[in-house]
Structure formats: C-alpha cells, structure tokens
Amino acid sequence: MASIRVADEPAFVLHSIPYKETSLILDVFTRQHGRMALIAKGAKRPHSVLRPVLQRFQPLLVSWSGKSELRTLTKSEWVGGMPSLVGDALLCGFYLNELLVKFLAREDDYERLYDRYSETINALSNLEFESKGLEEILRPFELSLLQETGYAAALDRCVETNDSPVFEALYVYQPERGVRPIQVDDPGHWPVLRGKSLLAIAAGDFSDPETLSESKQLMRFLLGLHLQDQVLTTRQILIDLKKI
C-alpha cells in the first residue's frame, strides 16, 4: 500500500492518550476523512511546537502521512477564532466528543456532521452571547449525528404513508422504522410527539418549549437504542444535572 499524504485538513482533536515517553496518539475528527488516529511524535516534550496547539475544541489544520491505520502527524496549525469552553459548555463539549467516538467508524467522511460539530462548538464557546440555551444548541447536533449515521429516520414523513405529520395529531417513533400515528397498543416507552413538533425538529427549530421537551425525549430514546448498556460519563453527568 502506498503511503498517503494529506495536507491542511480541517480537524478537531476528540481525544488523546500518551504514547511512549514523549508522544501522543490522537483521535481527531476531520472534515473530509472522518475520524483518524494520528501519532504526534514528541508532542509531550516541553518545547514541542505541537504541544500548545493540540487542544480539544479548537479548530485546527492538520497534515499527516503514512499507510497504516495509525498515521503520523506532520504538522498542526491552530486556526483560532473560538474562545475556550468553560463550565457547562465544557461538559457539553466532552459529551459531543464522546458521542462521535462511540458512533463514528474510522476514516468514514461526514462533512455535514463535521460542519454541524464546528457550529455547535462555536455556539458553546460563545454561550454568554447566545440567545439559545444548552439544549437548543445540542439538539440539532444530536439529530444530525443520528441521521448521518443512519440511526434516525426522517421526521417529516410518516413511514407507512409518506404523508407529512398533521400539526395537532399524535405520533410515535417506532424503533427500526420511524414516525407513524399513535395506536392504543403502542409500548409506553416509545416517544410520543405532536405533528407540530416533528415538523419543527426536522426543520431544526427548537424554539417552542413543548417541541424542545419532546425532542429531548426523542433524542434520549434514539441515542439509548444505539448505546444500549454503554454509559457515557459526561452524558450521564449532564442528565443528572438536568442540563440535557
């Protein structure tokens, strides 16, 4: 297999672990190549040019080479423009990273999801200036993640008829299928949503309090279906704190 070289690829660091005495193994989310495993040689050395750059939640341009699954980072440049995450916003950032690591296979490109992630991190980094709360910021990302990875069906069409939901009618989200009108014998744990909420969620509009509440129920259900018994540490903390 020929060695591959990639230059100046937009990326975010999701996670890093020490490797040998002076290096790091990075899990990075890139725009055109998806999740990549990169070794940053010498990044732990006190005077390494990489050390101050390889920070989570900061937009980077990274370059790498190699032909194995673990490529070698050859350059990393901080793009800038985003304040550091603090407080609840920092917890939410770790939550997003946990989701990406659990949901995304390596080296599958998700350009739209990358853009959504970048937008979400930017909104979290400017939380004090945002008119939206944490849940309004997080819900669109969760939905994008589920739909881009194939774990959520369309919300603006009924699975059996392909009709649009009726505003005041009630619907359930049936696992493995999608949205359909509610029935009396439906399991009680399936999410119940108004047609109005389904259409708003599909359009990315979470401004209505009832829609936001119903979207929370739906996202927890769909994420839980995929994660099953896996507990994401930051996600559980945010749930316990009633932040998401």
Curated annotation (Swiss-Prot):
Keywords for the protein's UniProt record, in alphabetical order: DNA damage, DNA recombination, DNA repair
Entry keyword annotation includes ATP-binding: no
Superkingdom of the organism of origin: Bacteria
Pfam families named in the record: RecO_C, RecO_N
Listed InterPro entries: ARFGAP/RecO (IPR037278), DNA_rep/recomb_RecO_N (IPR022572), NA-bd_OB-fold (IPR012340), RecO (IPR003717), RecO_C (IPR042242)
GO CC, any one term: bacterial nucleoid
Gene Ontology biological process terms in this record: DNA recombination; double-strand break repair
Known function: Involved in DNA repair and RecF pathway recombination.
NCBIfam families per UniProt: reco (TIGR00613)
UniProt xrefs under PANTHER family: DNA REPAIR PROTEIN RECO
Recorded family membership: Belongs to the RecO family.
Name the record gives this protein: DNA repair protein RecO
